[in-house]
A protein has these predicted regions:
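Conserved P-loop NTPase motor "coupling/switch" region that bridges the ATPase
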Residues: 297-300, 314-315, 319-322, 342, ...
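Conserved helix/coil segment N-terminal to the catalytic DExD/H
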Residues: 294, 332-367, 378-385
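Charged, low-complexity
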Residues: 2-4, 11-14, 24, 35, ...
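Conserved Helicase C-terminal RecA-like lobe
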Residues: 286-289, 293-302, 360, 468-495, ...
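Conserved SF1/SF2 helicase motif Ia
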Residues: 272, 276-279, 284-315, 394, ...
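Short Cys/His-based metal-binding microdomains
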Residues: 94-148
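Conserved helicase motor
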Residues: 308, 327-335, 349-355, 375-381, ...
């Protein structure tokens, strides 16, 4: 075997052999002439990553794709182990990533890689395992590590992430016999049954009595701990919390569906709350965090959200929980310091999180709340990759639209919640999409099966579903007459609209010029209903401002109510602001020209300043 120095940087060539390997002697005798003949090279078959070849199983096709990827990736380098028992290392020189591989030869059932693809695909291989076989021709594994010879409890990812016993070491037969009394079958797999995690813990202790070197992998311990925590949380809900007993959890009254969402998040631990906008996903996320803290399952929470929502999250956390929340901001060193603060809540933006991950900051949290998680719907973006690198025991993802266009977006979002929820990816795509001969997606199928798989992870309610649980909303439409000048402009454009619509009805066609004229006339009719000032900024004929001021005067004189006014037209709000100035009524004005950094300050002042009674906003304030 080559020493480590000789192995480092041994790249995978596209021919499938390690570069720099010594060739064999030709066997030619001295002085003998021999014609050098080129041996024909067998071209490797190329596989389409979108279309499974006829006569080939889905799994075999995926294994072939991983072998093909290993052959084509010139940035992979294989490092052989220094001694028997140590893993191989496969380094991506370009991405500066490293994966550990236990390699025992081509197609060995004992091969294991630390990468996510190996753990989720169920194929028993990955690009890194194939790279070792190509780069070294498998010679290291076949000669020195034919089969493992140890007793250990590990995760079999090929059989669906099941706990399995390997009993190939000294006293292995004794350990195997012992395992049959603790819920294992003849093949070494743990049988699914109630309370099995407790029996596994007891088995590990007795197995170590037989073999002090008995190994339990970290992944196995993680699963055992997760099973124990799941059972503990479920028991807490059954023993201590009814639907009404959550009322004192937050400094706010909760609707029944919100209590249901909090209990769902607490019980399942890693969830996506996908309620429609306006149903209070934020308060449910905070409620899950508070319940987990109260029962001792978490100590700290990290909220990752869009930049514009950082201060809103801070206000809501402090308002509903009464606890401190620190916003992660400043330069890299300042942000790194804030991550280490001993506070219950920390809040960072998606962009800051990306820079901190790339900068090497070790971001840790017991619970991570991802707000507006649909922003991570594109799997291959840097922000999505950085978010997937964050580790936590609990996750609450919030989104009103977890699926917008493509079904792959849902898979990307669910990887943040639980990377095994919909895995493996290739099977998910094969089961849910219809493709044409070119591999283009032309339809979807089996969507009901996705809903079944997501049941332990996703809860979604629509407004119509919970309407009876919510207080009635009072909608009141006030009709305001237009002035003579407004009516003249409105009628003129109304005539143009009527003429063009009649033309379309006769010919079923409008030219591009007529279409633009139609849209322009409709817009003018809408604008002039507010004020002629919105059109020309010279004249001002309107009645709506006076009526609005009358309503504002009536509301603020009878209590401490505050008023929010939306308008599509900034010019209309400018007139409104002039009237408020004249009456000396405090207000804040949010429009598209206000920098994002200053918007939280405007909202904060409106909410907290008793002298600020009115908030004016264009469409910019609705996001």
């Amino acid at each position: 075997m080559k020493n480590k120095a000789a192995e480092v940087g041994e790249k995978v060539g596209k021919t499938g052999k390690a570069t720099g390997a010594k060739g064999k002697s030709s066997g030619k005798k001295k002085g003998e002439k021999r014609t050098k003949q080129k041996q024909p090279r067998r071209a490797a078959q190329k596989y389409n990553p979108y279309i499974c070849p006829d006569g080939m199983s889905l799994e075999d096709w995926q294994r072939a794709l991983r072998c093909q990827a290993a052959m084509r990736d010139d940035h992979l380098a294989v490092q052989a182990p220094d001694k028997a028992g140590d893993p191989f290392k496969v380094v991506n020189i370009k991405k500066q990533t490293e994966h550990l591989v236990e390699y025992y030869g081509p197609k060995s059932e004992y091969n294991v890689c630390s990468c996510l693809d190996f753990k989720t695909s169920g194929l028993g291989t990955c690009k890194h395992i194939e790279a070792i076989g190509i780069a070294a021709d498998g010679r290291y594994a076949r000669k020195r590590y034919a089969k493992p010879s140890e007793n250990k409890l590990y995760i079999d990812y090929v059989e669906g992430r099941r706990i399995r016993l390997m009993s190939r070491g000294e006293n292995g037969e004794s350990i195997k016999r012992l395992s049959l009394d603790y819920g294992f079958d003849e093949e070494g797999y743990v049988l699914e049954r109630e309370g099995i995690h407790e029996k596994i813990v007891e088995f590990i202790a007795k197995a170590r009595d037989i073999d002090p070197g008995f190994v339990t992998t970290d992944e196995t311990l993680d699963i055992i701990i997760t099973l124990r925590q799941n059972k503990a949380r479920k028991k807490v809900l059954e023993d201590k919390y009814t639907s009404s007993s959550l009322d004192g959890l937050l400094k706010a009254s909760l609707y029944p569906y919100q209590r249901e969402g909090i209990k769902f998040g607490f019980e399942h631990g890693r969830v996506l709350i996908a309620d429609e906008m306006g149903l209070g996903k934020t308060i449910q996320g905070i409620g899950v965090a508070e319940l987990l803290m109260r029962e001792g399952f978490v100590n700290n929470v990290l909220v990752v959200c869009p930049t514009s929502l950082k201060y809103q999250w801070k206000r809501e956390i402090e308002r509903f929980s009464g606890k401190d929340a620190e916003i992660v901001e400043g330069n890299l060193m300042q942000r790194r310091k804030i991550y280490g603060f001993d506070v219950p809540y920390r809040i960072c933006s998606y962009n800051s999180m990306l820079h901190d991950v790339k900068g090497g900051t070790d971001i840790k949290a017991d619970l991570i709340i991802y707000d507006e998680v649909q922003r991570l719907k594109n799997w291959d973006t840097q922000i999505a990759k950085a978010a997937r690198s964050l580790k936590s025991d609990y996750v609450v993802a919030l989104s009103g639209t977890p699926l917008e266009n493509k079904i792959t977006e849902l898979y990307s979002v669910m990887e943040l919640v639980d990377q095994y929820a919909l895995a493996p990816y290739y099977k998910f795509i094969a089961d849910t999409t219809e493709r044409d001969a070119t591999g283009r997606v032309v339809g979807y199928r089996n969507l009901n099966h996705i809903a079944e798989r997501l049941a332990p992870y996703l809860i979604r309610r629509r407004k119509k579903d919970v309407a009876l649980q919510m207080p009635p909303r009072t909608d009141k439409t006030l009709f305001v007459p237009m002035t003579k000048e407004q009516m003249e402009i409105h009628s003129e454009n109304q005539f143009t609209v009527a003429r063009l619509i009649e033309k379309w009805r006769r010919t079923m066609f409008l030219s591009e010029k007529d279409r633009k004229k139609l849209l322009m006339s409709l817009s003018i009719m809408r604008m002039v209903c507010d004020s002629t000032f919105v059109l020309d900024q010279r004249s001002r004929h309107d009645t709506k401002i006076a009526e609005t001021m009358h309503i504002i005067d009536e509301m603020i004189s009878n209590g401490d109510e505050k008023v929010v006014i939306f308008s599509q037209w900034e010019r209309m709000l400018r007139i409104m602001a002039q009237s408020l100035d004249k009456e000396k009524i405090g207000y804040r004005f949010l429009h598209g020209g206000v920098p994002s950094a200053k918007r939280p300050e405007l909202i904060e002042d409106f909410l907290e300043n008793p002298q600020c009674r009115v908030f004016l906003s264009t469409d910019a304030g609705s996001t």
